[in-house]
Amino acid sequence: MRHYELVLLVHPDQSDQVVGMVERYIKLVQDNNGTIHRLEDWGRRQLAYPINKIHKAHYVLFNIETDGETLAELEELFRYNDAIIRSLVMRRDDAVTEESQLAKNADEKRARKATTRRPDSNDDNDNHSDD
């Protein structure tokens, strides 16, 4: 079995359907003795250029280990699913299990946002003293 990295761009109007679609693709891979090494939902992002007058898409990344027949079946499902506006399949030498740079950056951004304290309007009232 070979290792593959798949990126799907889903129509933004179908973002709520992504979970069900991903579950179907995972089930197909696992039913054919494949393995999911990494799954990341990057959410809705701006496209570099419009595709069919669409400016945003919902991105999903998979790293899988599967055989050629299952991969061909997945690609056919992607091709005939109108909700998927683009798909990319790359063969990898090894299984990639670590978090992608995009996901790491998003985690760091969330952590910075959580540690940044916003001034509270009640703090000004707590500092006065009664004379």
UniProtKB/Swiss-Prot annotation:
InterPro entries: Ribosomal_bS6, Ribosomal_bS6_CS, Ribosomal_bS6_sf, Ribosomal_S6_plastid/chlpt, Transl_elong_EF1B/ribsomal_bS6. Keywords: Ribonucleoprotein, Ribosomal protein, RNA-binding, rRNA-binding. Residues 117-131 have a biased composition (Basic and acidic residues). Transmembrane segments: none annotated. GO terms for cellular component: cytosolic small ribosomal subunit. One of its GO terms (molecular function) is small ribosomal subunit rRNA binding. One of its GO terms (biological process) is translation. Gene3D superfamilies: 3.30.70.60. The keyword Heme does not apply. Residues 94-131 are annotated as: Disordered. It holds the Pfam family Ribosomal_S6. HAMAP family: Ribosomal_bS6. Belongs to the bacterial ribosomal protein bS6 family. Binds together with bS18 to 16S ribosomal RNA. This is Small ribosomal subunit protein bS6. It comes from Psychrobacter cryohalolentis (strain ATCC BAA-1226 / DSM 17306 / VKM B-2378 / K5). The lineage of its organism: Bacteria, Pseudomonadati, Pseudomonadota, Gammaproteobacteria, Moraxellales. The gene is rpsF.
